[in-house]
From Swiss-Prot:
It comes from the Bacteria. Its cofactor is Mn(2+); Mg(2+). It is found in: Cytoplasm. One of its GO terms (molecular function) is manganese ion binding. This is Ribonuclease HII. Manganese or magnesium. Binds 1 divalent metal ion per monomer in the absence of substrate. May bind a second metal ion after substrate binding. The keyword Transport does not apply. Transmembrane segments: none annotated. It is an enzyme of class 3 (hydrolase). Its main location: cytoplasm.
C-alpha cells in the first residue's frame, strides 16, 4: 500500500505535507518542500521519492506544481556549517512553510522532529512519505529540484560526480576531493571535508 489522504482528511482544513532532501551529502544545500494538495486533484502514483524512477519523479513533480500550492525552502552550505545540519534542515522547512500562498492550518512533517517556529500546529509522521500523499508530493518536488541544482553545479565543478551522486559521499566524490580539493559548495563541518581541510 502506498501513501493516502487519510491523515489529511482526519485533520481537516488546509494541511501541508513537508519533507526534506539532502541532509547527508558532503556538498550542496539542504532542500525542503511544503505542499498543500487539493483532495480532488491528487496526482496518481505519489510515493516516497526514493521508490520512484527519475523519469517518474520528474513527471509527477510537473503535475504537483500544476495542481497544488508548492513552496521550496533552502538552507545553504554556509548555513549548514554555521548552524549544524539539523538546525539548517529546520530552517529550510520553515522557509518552505512560509512561502506557501495560503497559510495552512496544520503541517505534517516527515520524520520524528517538528521544526521550532512554524506558523501553524504540526504533527510528525515517521516514514511519512510512504503514508501521506502530501508528504510524498513534497519529497518528490524537493528531490527533483535539488537534483537539478546539483547537476548544474556539476557542470561548474566537474570531477566530483555530482551529476549522479548529488553530493553524497561516493568513491568518485572522494576521489574528486583527493585530486581537486574542496569547493565552496562542500560542507566544511562534515567530517570527510574537515579532515581534508585539516590536512
Amino acid at each position: 500500500m502506498g501513501p493516502d489522504f487519510e491523515i489529511e482528511r482526519e485533520l481537516g482544513g488546509l494541511v501541508a505535507g513537508v519533507d526534506e532532501v539532502g541532509r547527508g551529502p558532503w556538498a550542496g544545500p539542504v532542500t525542503a518542500c511544503a505542499v498543500v494538495l487539493d483532495p480532488m486533484q491528487v496526482p496518481d502514483g505519489l510515493n516516497d521519492s526514493k521508490k520512484l524512477s527519475e523519469a517518474r519523479r520528474d513527471a509527477l513533480a510537473m503535475q504537483i506544481l500544476r495542481v497544488a500550492d508548492v513552496s521550496l525552502g533552502w538552507a545553504s552550505v554556509e548555513e549548514i556549517d554555521a548552524l549544524n545540519i539539523r538546525q539548517a534542515t529546520f530552517l529550510a522547512m520553515r522557509r518552505a512553510m512560509d512561502g506557501l500562498t495560503t497559510p495552512p492550518t496544520h503541517a505534517l512533517i516527515d520524520g520524528n522532529a517538528i521544526p521550532p517556529g512554524l506558523s501553524c500546529p504540526a504533527t510528525c509522521v515517521v516514514k511519512g512519505d510512504g503514508r501521506s500523499v502530501s508528504i510524498a508530493a513534497a519529497s518528490i518536488v524537493a528531490k527533483v529540484r535539488r537534483d537539478a541544482l546539483m547537476k548544474e553545479l556539476a557542470v561548474m565543478h566537474p570531477g566530483y560526480g555530482w551529476e549522479t551522486n548529488m553530493g553524497y559521499g561516493t568513491a568518485k566524490h572522494a576521489a574528486g576531493l583527493h585530486h581537486l580539493g574542496v569547493t565552496q559548495y562542500h560542507r566544511r563541518s562534515f567530517a570527510p571535508i574537515a579532515k581534508i581541510l585539516c590536512g
